[in-house]
Amino acid sequence: MKNARVLMFGWEFPPHISGGLGTACLGIAQGLAKNGVKVLFVMPKASGDEDGSVAKIINASDVEMLQNTEKIEDFWKHINFMEIGSNLVPYLDPETFARERDQYLKEGEHRQRISYHNKFQFSGKYGANLMEEVYRYALVAGTVAKRYEFDVIHAHDWLTYSAGIIAKKISGKPLIVHVHATEYDRGGEYNRNTLVYDIEKRGMEAADRVVTVSNWTRNIVIEKYGIPAEKVITVHNAVDFKAETDAKEERGIKDKIVTFLGRITLQKGPEYFVEAAAKVMKRMPNVRFVMAGSGEKMNPLVRRVAQLGLGTRFHFTGFLRGNDVQRMFQYSDVYVMPSVSEPFGISPLEAMRSGVPTIISKQSGVAEVLDHAIKVDYWDINALADAIYGILAYPTLAHYMQREGYDEVNKLKWENASLKLKNIYESLI
């Protein structure tokens, strides 16, 4: 069989990313390239510095529409503006989101949505007009599907499911939707956004195969979305392995550092990290706790830290990117991911790659592939505090976790994950 050609839809691609989704897209593309699969990667707005050696990058903002666009404005007259909540813009700084929302409302309904030569202009961000961009991106997908040759369609997360559906209808080629997270993870049972849930469900139903990043997510897809089990396949995420353990930096303090790195939202369980920190401080005062990230629970947690008397031992850094993330790992003695519902969780792999002993919640996909991280129930702050204390108090345990964890993540390669995807492609072609 000839090498497969995949038309892939994704909202972001390194080096300009906002979180784990873009990192995963790059890892998958790199792995597919090593396995002989040619990737056409369609993103809303390319910057020109993406890695073109692993995928042909198609900038949706540069695609001249083939369809008649006269009815687009009529369509939007019947769509009420919906403010996108922070749970739908998971990697956008709250201040940036507010600024974009205000700018969008200021510009009003009559701004031009089609530019010269029938090209849509995308921001490629998670801003207040996100739903509008999702719709326009799907229209562009129809043009791309007519213009390029490919064998299979692969759509990453709910933002691109509609694009995948349209590409399938136009081309007749099989569709795979890749579930990196669900609305149940973001909003829980009673706080989910019904519009996003409907988009997710429609995408899963239209797909020929549904790929999930963990068995944890697979069970949610089957039970909460009603997707037949035989249609849903788990392909665990991996990590771009880089030897980072020799890159420790002088941090200027002797205190131990325990780090939470992620969105400060309900899904990520930051309040359990704060409560566990208070318990650890009663047993070991020479510890500092760092919460690196942003989100709607940040201000309440700042107040809670003050109530607990942790103000001088607890630090909020805001959202970190790129080298700042790696520097934070280099400073850390323990990394904690206490997520309430985590589809996978790449950050623990990155921490362990950096030689940081790691604690994760049992309610996570990454718990399925790690043996050398301590696993606790997200709600059990006593167990979490004990785990943090144990790593800090017993150097032998810390060194064991560093060594074994480092070796373990070295085996979780994107090339292996992508080989599973290649096999799925070939089963559908």
Annotated model-derived regions:
Residues N3-A4, L40-A145:
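A conserved catalytic-core segment of Leloir-type glycosyltransferases
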Residues V211, G252-A277, Q402:
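Conserved donor-binding/catalytic core segment of Leloir-type glycosyltransferases
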Residues W216, A238:
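Carbohydrate-associated surface elements
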Residues F319-L320, R327-S332:
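Short alpha-helical donor nucleotide-sugar binding micro-motif in glycosyltransferases
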Residues A373-N382, G390-P395:
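Conserved acidic donor-binding segment of nucleotide-sugar-dependent glycosyltransferases
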Residues V340:
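Aromatic "clamp/platform" in nucleotide-sugar-dependent glycosyltransferases that forms part
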Residues P357-I360:
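Short hydrophobic beta-strand element within catalytic cores of glycosyltransferases
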Residues P300-L320:
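Nucleotide-activated donor-binding/catalytic signature segment of Leloir-type glycosyltransferases, i.e.
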